[in-house]
């Protein structure tokens, strides 16, 4: 006959399962920390590496290049919003005569897997922010905690030194001044 003090009794095992579930819930709640604000203005920078995927060129007329950009974000105020997110963008770079622009779309993903989607255009510049003279992102939506998010993100383009190796990879820091609102 077993005593109730043995570690493999049904009562002890059930207690351990309940305790581990309770501890998991407490740790998860603590890890989530403060909730995300519903509205705000956030300065952040994305550290990007650009990879050319395909290019068309007609000498003397112009080029069009498909680019993939990957990187991470850093909130400049040390806040949770738009900090430590992975960034993945698809872009089209066009240069023809006096026209030079890059259009595209980006997805920012946080550690929970929640996403923010935006489009961008380097021809749309917010003249009220002269330091952000490279273009503007338009936040069109999100998933999870970012569901219902909209906003604008004027941005600058700060080129970094050339990357080593082949493939035409380039890098850039892109600071943003983001005004956003989550309407759920």
Describe each model-derived feature in a short phrase.
Residues 2-17:
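Bacterial N-terminal signal peptides that target proteins for export
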Residues 17-18, 180:
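Hydrophobic transmembrane signal anchors and adjacent membrane-proximal interface regions, especially
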Residues 18-19, 99:
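Residues at structural and domain junctions
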Residues 32-184:
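Beta-strand-enriched cores of mature, soluble protein domains
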């Amino acid at each position: 006959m077993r005593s109730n003090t043995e570690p493999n009794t049904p009562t002890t095992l059930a207690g351990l399962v309940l305790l581990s579930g309770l501890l998991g819930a407490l740790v998860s709640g603590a890890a989530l920390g403060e909730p995300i604000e519903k509205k705000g203005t956030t300065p952040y920078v994305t550290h990007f590496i650009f990879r050319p995927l395909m290019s068309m060129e007609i000498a003397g007329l112009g080029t069009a290049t498909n680019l993939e950009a990957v990187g991470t974000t850093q909130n400049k105020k040390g806040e949770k919003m738009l900090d430590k997110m992975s960034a993945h963008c698809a872009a089209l770079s066009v240069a023809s005569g006096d026209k030079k622009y890059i259009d595209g779309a980006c997805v920012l993903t946080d550690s929970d897997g929640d996403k923010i989607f935006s489009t961008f255009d380097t021809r749309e510049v917010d003249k009220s922010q002269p330091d952000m003279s490279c273009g503007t992102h338009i936040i069109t939506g999100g998933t999870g905690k970012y569901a219902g998010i909209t906003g604008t993100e004027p941005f600058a383009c700060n080129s970094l030194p050339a990357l080593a190796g082949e493939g035409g990879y380039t890098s850039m820091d892109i600071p943003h001044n983001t005004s956003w609102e989550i309407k759920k």
